[in-house]
Amino acid sequence: MSKVIGIDLGTTNSCVAIMEGGEPVVIANSEGSRTTPSMVAFAESGERLVGQQAKRQAVTNPENTLFAIKRLIGRKFDTDEVRKDISISPFKIVKADNGDAWVDVRGKMYSPPEVSAIVLQKMKKTAEDYLGETVTDAVITVPAYFNDSQRQATKDAGKIAGLNVLRIINEPTAAALAYGLDKKKDEKIAVFDLGGGTFDISILELGDGVFEVKSTNGDTFLGGEDFDQRVIDWIADEFKKDQGIDLRGDKMALQRLKEAAEKAKCELSSSMETDINLPFITADATGPKHLTMKLSRAKLEALCAELLDKLEGPCRTALKDAGLSPSEVDEVILVGGMTRMPAVQKRVQEIFGKAPNKGVNPDEVVAIGAGIQGGVLRGDVKDVLLLDVTPLSLGIETLGSVMTKLIDKNTTIPCRKSQVFSTASDNQPAVTIHVLQGEREMASDNKTLGNFELTGIPPAPRGVPQIEVTFDIDANGIVHVSAKDLGTGKEQSIRITASSGLSKEEIDKMVREAESHAADDKKKRELIEARNHADTLAYSTEKSLKEYGDKIGDDEKKKIEEAVAALKKAMEGDDVDAIKQATDALTQASHKLAEAVYAKTQTEGGAQPGAEADGDTGAKGGEKVVDADFEEVKDDKK
């Protein structure tokens, strides 16, 4: 089995790790960073930029730079979360034909899995460059509180990126795996994961290589992006009060505010006050305007007080579901960049009554855990058993529009559960199975995962037919449902792809597009490499021609000059083969010149033996030095 990589596909940043020599290794990208911004930009030339390259040009290209796409993955357009995103995003979020939230960039629509796939391709390439071989198998992490639609969409993203997703693993569980791999003692831990866009809390029991999740809870729309937005709004409001100009109408200015807000928030984790300076942020009739203000840590905490308050509820629920009091938790592990904020750490200490453990790198620990899980699946890591849970209850709609639960939240997965139902009216020929996920009593208040029909039920009075509904959740937390008429043996089943989601045809089309983009990227890289090689050769040839041109005949010199000119002309075009041919032609033409350079070097080198002979006395002096050193060693020994 080939190498299995572990990818933390984050809202703000992504990270990739692998097991090597029995140890997890985080792989640095081509820019030398161990994390990669989860950003994708589309340049005017049609070129796609990913990661740091996309982030660097975001200010000048805000409408075509996509970030925090994870917050849209597996979501319907007509939801409060998406409406909130639309109000603050510089890029265009649109409604797809299936009702999902997609993005529109330069007139082309992209699904969130498609955009996430571009980031995953970057992580795949990072791993391949490091390993020197093709990688296809991967473990990808998701927030523990992701529902089935979001998990399926993440798996689709992996497929579009050309990855065989062996397992979808919950982020807090991955972090626990990284933390507890070498721990021998039994302990109960809480993993507090506050990242760029999501918040998870999981309670686990660790012991003898068994990692058992007891409960999980969270909020898939609470993270660093929301904290940044509070700072952005404050800066914009203060500037409007001061200058009478609302910067929210200027997308370029807004992108600068976003970067400044994120920077200020990070700086306030280690200092009590920071300066925000944005020269030439805008202009009016009186001239250019500069933005200069101070933000204190106390002010930041006041701005984000409501968000900090939201952290407590899920923690209390998770503890209650696990049947534990805060004092029974041995360690609280902090995961996600936002846990560096002192106010978050203070809130964690208040909830659990103990100082959190800061022994893991919050940016890398999830990818490390995914890498370890990859090692487990490959058989490289022995004696590790991961028992995860489903974060939300699963059930179907029954008479009176009530949700009847078949599998309760925090049930260990994989699992399978069946229940027998009947018809609601006489001679009912078919039943519609409305599959739901959530904790509310009424069906309409929960998330619809899908609908399917069991038909051909023989005429019978209500309550007589026996319809067995079976829920099956796999190790990825993805749901399969079947319904069987026990009287006739007739069965109907579906793998839930949600009432929205991507069809197989759409995924296949996106896979083909991703492959063609990868081929385009390869061609671009080949062109750049060919140009670089040609440029180096042309420069060195011209330099040698100036120095040694008088050592060769005029005809040879003319041939070389013509070959250099032909190569420079070829470099102006995009034909890789033409550049390579012109490069070869120049190499051939400059053979005589190379001989002249070599001959001169040999002549200069000919003086060296004489110099060495003259230096005999120096050599003897050198020997004396060695003797002296030797004498000193002797003295030391004495």
Curated annotation (Swiss-Prot):
Gene3D superfamilies membership: 1.20.1270.10, 3.30.420.40, Actin, Chain A, domain 4, Substrate Binding Domain Of DNAk, Chain A, domain 1
Function in brief: Acts as a chaperone.
Ranges where the record places region Disordered: 600-638
One example GO MF annotation: ATP binding
ATP-binding in keyword set: yes
CDD domains referenced in this protein's UniProt entry, alphabetically: ASKHA_NBD_HSP70_DnaK-like
Family of this protein: Belongs to the heat shock protein 70 family.
Entry protein name: Chaperone protein DnaK
This protein's UniProt keywords: ATP-binding, Chaperone, Nucleotide-binding, Phosphoprotein, Stress response
Keyword Chaperone: yes
Upregulation: By stress conditions e.g. heat shock.
Sites bearing Phosphothreonine, chain numbering: T198
Source organism phylogeny: Bacteria, Pseudomonadati, Thermodesulfobacteriota, Desulfuromonadia, Geobacterales
